[in-house]
Regions:
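Short, surface-exposed ligand- or partner-binding patches at beta-edge/loop junctions that are enriched
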Residues: 57
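Rhodanese-like catalytic fold shared by cysteine-dependent sulfurtransferases
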Residues: 1-15, 22-53, 64-121
Length: 121
């Protein structure tokens, strides 16, 4: 699902789940997303509302695909977002860096790039 479609679904009440690692979440995220790292998803899926659609994102697409499949297998209406967080940013949609401030597109890209360079390999 493309980022603009995801935004529309979220506006209509869908849940947005970020399955990236803690350091990625800290660097920047989509405002309003719930952070459920992939390695914690099985134990924390109960935090999600089964009555509302779930859209899952990560950095590039593979983790969110796995998470969406796992959630669908557990009875959720779950869909991965195409292109991950970079596609969201490229679509000009807002990101939220640490501290709760929703950055403009260019600001968020700078934050993400700086964090990516300083992240452990």
């Amino acid at each position: 699902m493309e980022p603009n479609e995801v935004q529309k679904l979220v506006d209509e009440g869908a849940q947005l789940v970020d399955v990236r690692a803690d350091y990625e979440w800290d660097a920047g995220r989509i405002a309003g997303a719930v952070h459920l790292p992939l390695d914690q998803l099985a134990g924390r899926a109960g935090e999600l509302d089964r009555e509302r659609p779930v859209v899952v994102y990560c950095r590039g697409g593979s983790r969110c695909q796995m998470a969406a499949e796992a959630l669908a297998g557990a009875g959720f209406d779950a869909t991965p977002m195409d292109g991950g967080l970079p596609a969201w940013e490229e679509a000009g949609l807002p990101l939220e860096p640490e501290g709760g401030y929703v950055a403009e597109s260019g600001e968020a890209a700078a934050v993400l790039e700086a964090r990516k360079r300083s992240a452990p390999d």
